Amino acid sequence: GCYDKITAINGKRIDDFGSYDKAVAAVRGKAGGVVQLGIHQYATNQDVTLSVTRAEYEQIHVTSRMLDNQIGYIRIEKFADNTDEQFDAAVKEMQKQGAASLLFDLRNNPGGQLTALVNCLDTLLPEGKIISLKDKAGKTEKYTSDANAVDLPMAVLVNADSYSAAEFFAAALQEYGKATIVGEKTVGKGYSQQGFELSNGGCLNISTHCYYTPKGVSLIGKGVTPDKQADLKNKKKEHFYVLRDSED
C-alpha cells in the first residue's frame, strides 16, 4: 500500500523476528528508553532510521460517535483490562450527546477478559445474572449486575468472527430483551483456557471452565443466532436503525 513501513527494529529486520508479537515486544520497554526504527518512506522511496523515545500510553479498545437519527455508535475492538472504563465513558458520552438509541459493534471482536465483559454488561443490564462458569468438578461461579441500567433501545452487530466474550455480550443483551442482535451467527466459543509454559519454550493451553449465558445456555459449537440476519463483513455497513419491537 501507499504507506511508510517499519522495516527494522534496533537494526534487526522485521522479517527476522518471526512473529508480530516478538516484533512488538522489541519495541516495548521502559518509558524514556529509546528504540531505533528503520523506516521505508513511500513518498521518497528511501530508507531512514528514526530514534523514538518510549512513553506510556493507553490502548484504545472502545471508540464512539453519533450517527444519523441520534444513534450512538460504540465499537468494541476487544475486552482488555481497560475496555470497561472506556466503554462506560463512551456510553455516558453518547447519552450526553442525546443518543436516542445505542448500536454496539462487536464484529471481528476476539473476546478477551472476563472481568471487562462483566463490567461492560453491568453498565447496561438491570439487576440479575450476567454469566456463570463451571469447572470439570461442577463448581460454579456466578457474576451478577446491579440495579443500575441503561434504558435505551439497543442493537448489537456481530459476525462469524465475533468470538468468546463478544458472543456472551450479545447473548446476555439478547436474553434480557435489551437489544436486537444483527448480523451473522457467531463462532460458538464457550470455554476458557489456562496457559502453561513448556520447557521447550512453547505453551500449552488447557480448557478449564465452560461459560453459560444468564439463562444457563452453553454457546459451545452453537454461537449466537442473530435476530436479524445480515451480511456485515463490510465495515462500512454500520448504519442500522435501532427500533423498539413496537416500531420494528
Residue ranges and their predicted role:
Residues 62-248:
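C-terminal "post-core" interaction segments
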Residues 11, 54, 76:
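Active-site donor-binding loop signature of nucleotide-sugar glycosyltransferases
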Residues 13-14, 55, 226-227:
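A short acidic/small-residue loop/turn micro-motif
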Residues 2-38, 116, 189-190, 195:
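PDZ domains, with a preference for the canonical peptide-binding region formed by the helix
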